[in-house]
Curated annotation (Swiss-Prot):
It comes from Corynebacterium efficiens (strain DSM 44549 / YS-314 / AJ 12310 / JCM 11189 / NBRC 100395). The gene is aroQ2. Signal peptide: none annotated. It holds the Pfam family DHquinase_II. This is 3-dehydroquinate dehydratase 2. Belongs to the type-II 3-dehydroquinase family.
Amino acid sequence: MHVLVINGPNLNRLGKRQPEVYGSTTLADVEAMVARRADALGVGVSFIQSNHEGELIDAVHNAADHGWPVIINPGGFTHTSVALRDALAEIADGAGFVEVHISNVHAREPFRAHSYLSPIALGVIAGLGVRGYELALEFLADRER
């Protein structure tokens, strides 16, 4: 099994941008944590982060072509991107995806409570900090067994 972990806009700024909301853990820290957990689970994992919608869509298409499940933190595209949802629909029809948010998006500004992706996701993890990525990985690994 192989899982693609996708991080959307501004997540390259983890540890620097709004640490009171997102904490001090960097994206490199998150990727290392997930890679360690994936290794322990016997799961292959790869990562992409982009601030550009088209690059994320291309990554989703690549995952679909390989039959990989996806863990995605779409950042601000959660609330705005029909195109990303359309790409993820192919994953939803196949291996499936889990939507992850570091902060509790439902406890923040009202516009953050709406997700174009949640209705087609296997599940949504929000507000559990960076641990949400590991929980998503564990869920996907358990699902394969």
